[in-house]
């Protein structure tokens, strides 16, 4: 089965927050997934939407697939490297803060009847 994918790496948002959006679009038709992401209130929905648009463009351009029949076959997020920062606390101490990054991958394939 032909499958087109797109990846967005080093996105400065925690993987937990991305998974909330990614889990909603897995298995959906591309058009309905685009609508869901366009009207989502989550900030990361815009990044996931751009990744999905890139996967659709890859399917159309590289594989010659029909856009109307595409389904989100895979959608997952992996944790990228974390930036370590320090936050000042009481009594001269400091605690470490992790600024997490994400690698977002979306794959689309034609719907099987």
UniProtKB/Swiss-Prot annotation:
Gene Ontology CC entries for this record: cytosolic large ribosomal subunit
Family annotation (SUPFAM superfamilies): Ribosomal protein L22
A Gene Ontology biological process term: translation
PROSITE patterns the record matches: RIBOSOMAL_L22
Keywords on record: Ribonucleoprotein, Ribosomal protein, RNA-binding, rRNA-binding
Pfam families attached to this UniProt entry: Ribosomal_L22
Database matches in Gene3D superfamilies: Ribosomal protein L22/L17
InterPro entries membership: Ribosomal_uL22 (IPR001063), Ribosomal_uL22_bac/chlpt-type (IPR005727), Ribosomal_uL22_bac/org-type (IPR047867), Ribosomal_uL22_CS (IPR018260), Ribosomal_uL22_sf (IPR036394)
Organism superkingdom: Bacteria
Keyword flag Cell wall biogenesis/degradation: no
CDD domains per UniProt: Ribosomal_L22
Alphabetized GO MF terms: rRNA binding; structural constituent of ribosome
PANTHER family per the UniProt record, alphabetical: CHLOROPLAST 50S RIBOSOMAL PROTEIN L22-RELATED, LARGE RIBOSOMAL SUBUNIT PROTEIN UL22M
Subunit annotation: Part of the 50S ribosomal subunit.
Function: This protein binds specifically to 23S rRNA; its binding is stimulated by other ribosomal proteins, e.g. L4, L17, and L20. It is important during the early stages of 50S assembly. It makes multiple contacts with different domains of the 23S rRNA in the assembled 50S subunit and ribosome.
Family: Belongs to the universal ribosomal protein uL22 family.
Name listed for the protein in its UniProt record: Large ribosomal subunit protein uL22
Lineage, broadest ranks: Bacteria, Pseudomonadati, Pseudomonadota, Alphaproteobacteria, Magnetococcales
Gene behind this protein: rplV
